[in-house]
Amino acid sequence: VYVNGKQVSQFDYLLKEDDLVEIKKENNLPLEILYEDQDFVVINKPSGLLSMSDGKEKEKTAYHYVSEYLKKQNKNQKVFIVHRLDRETSGVLMFCKNEKVRDLLQKDWNKIVYLRGYMALVEGKGLKKQGTLKNYLAESKTQQVYISNKEKGKLAITHYKVIKEMKNQTLLEINLDTGRKNQIRVQLSNINHPIVGDKKYGATSNPIRRLGLHAHAFGFVHPKTKKKYEFKTDCPKEFYGR
């Protein structure tokens, strides 16, 4: 309980006229809730946390923490995942509270979601100030995504803009037209600028001790109300170098 912005624990505390009383719920989640309403929960997922279970890890996932958080409010509340971020990617991740809205989103995902923005710290420098990467991507039996052709792969379109050049790295702002698995990681590796910390796709350095990819912006049109929602988070400070 807070009175005029200060926490109060005294059970017989006397209130005065015009005192502002606030009751704040404790939130011990290892992630930040950016927004919540009757249909959605939007979080800022930390790096290192799975979006949902991979069959091995069931409890320490964003899905698990959000589900437990909602069940404390309503034991019958369900949660549905509509998109994912890789374990080592941080940033904006959305969950649905009901199946109907989930289905509407998935049915017209590319029409409903109008903004998918990332910040990427890549190896090397010398990139054009801005550019567009277009490739066809396919996935091997070992879950390695690779550049393919039109017959075997799916089209992936990524736009980038140079934000800052450092001694051995470049910070990019990324916007997606498509949302293929590992899209940004594979396409940047293909132009010899892999994301730092991304050993899977050719990175040889890891100066920030994590994958240099952060989903900083996400925008969509509510499939029922047609209202626009847009969420943005700060780029991790370590991406800017010293």
Predicted regions and their residues:
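Short beta-strand/turn micro-motifs at beta-sheet edges
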Residues: 30-32, 80, 148-149, 159-161
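RNA pseudouridine synthases
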Residues: 1-141, 237-241
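Short small-residue beta-strand/loop micro-motif enriched in glycine and branched aliphatics
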Residues: 49-52, 145-146, 170
